[in-house]
Structure formats: structure tokens, C-alpha cells
Regions:
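Acidic, metal-coordinating helix/loop segments flanking the phosphotransfer/catalytic sites
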Residues: 25, 39-57
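Conserved phosphotransfer cores of two-component systems
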Residues: 51-53, 73-80, 100
Length: 165
């Protein structure tokens, strides 16, 4: 097995569903057994961890734990953040995550593929990382969102090519 860029990293996962946290931890540790994964099921616990610990990546659920409030705190501490959602899977939430400087926006349906997305969060800077996300999930987003969602939200990522090279 190839060594992952996540190996040895400290990751905080936050979701109000303990089974999602268990699945995230399992997926991460299978690929990167030397990762340290902390978990929080409440906003309050997440704030305590975010304020007291340095993380390489923070994975935040949007809905049940006030994810956008936690995103603001995590970004203010210069943590790389991956937003995770099922209920807020819409172009407006995606745009908000982008504007608030999250590094990626993952549908919970893609939890089985979380490690490559988190590796991209570590490998790529902000715009190149989002461009890579859209390249990987364009078909998925197109099937879930209205047509031209990217243009209507102003997230016309195809135009970022020159910026991201």
C-alpha cells in the first residue's frame, strides 16, 4: 500500500451522527493507520477541540453541529476544512462553503471515497483544490443540482484554469 499524504496527520471530524464519525474514522485509519482522528458530536465539544488543538484537517458536517459557524472558527485558526453534508447538498451551501474558505465540499454519499478527497485538501491550495473537486464531482453535482448551477452561483470553475496552473 502506498503511503498517504495524510499519514501522521491530526484530523478532527465533527458530525451529530456518531455512526458517520465511526465510518469516517474507519475510512481514514484503513488508509492511514498513523493518523490521529479526534471526534466531536456537538458544537460545544467541537469548539473546545478547535480552540485547544492544532489540526491538519477538520471535517465538518454542515447541518446538525452549526457547521458554518465551526468553519469560520477553523479557518480563523488556519485549518484546512472539508465540509460534509447530506441535507445541505445544494448550490447555495456549496457556494457559501467556497466563499468561507473551506477547502472542499463532500456529499455524505461519497464517504467511501473520503480519503482521496482529504489527500487533495493537503496537496492543493485553495482554488486548485476546488477546481479538482469540481472536475471529480461535476457529474454528481450536475445530477443533484439544477442545470447551470455553477454559472448561476458564480462558481464557474472552468474559468479558473489559468489561475490554477
Amino acid at each position: 500500500m502506498n503511503e498517504s499524504i495524510l499519514d501522521g496527520k491530526r484530523i478532527l471530524t465533527v458530525d451529530d451522527e456518531p455512526e458517520i464519525l465511526e465510518l469516517l474514522e474507519e475510512e481514514i485509519l484503513i488508509a492511514c493507520p498513523n493518523c490521529k482522528v479526534d471526534k466531536a458530536t456537538t458544537y460545544k465539544r467541537a469548539v473546545i477541540l478547535l480552540e485547544s488543538t492544532i489540526y491538519d484537517i477538520v471535517v465538518l458536517d454542515i447541518m446538525g453541529v452549526r457547521g458554518f459557524d465551526l468553519l469560520n472558527l477553523a479557518v480563523s485558526r488556519n485549518f484546512r476544512v472539508a465540509m460534509l453534508t447530506a441535507h445541505a447538498l445544494n448550490p447555495q451551501a456549496l457556494k457559501k462553503a467556497f466563499e468561507m474558505k473551506a477547502r472542499t465540499y463532500l456529499p455524505k454519499e461519497k464517504l467511501g471515497e473520503v480519503v482521496p478527497f482529504l489527500e487533495d485538501v493537503m496537496k492543493y491550495e485553495y482554488l486548485p483544490g476546488w477546481k479538482r473537486l469540481f472536475e471529480k464531482l461535476k457529474g454528481f453535482f450536475d445530477s443533484r443540482f439544477e442545470s447551470d448551477w455553477d454559472k448561476k452561483t458564480g462558481l464557474n470553475w472552468r474559468e479558473w484554469g489559468k489561475v490554477c496552473l
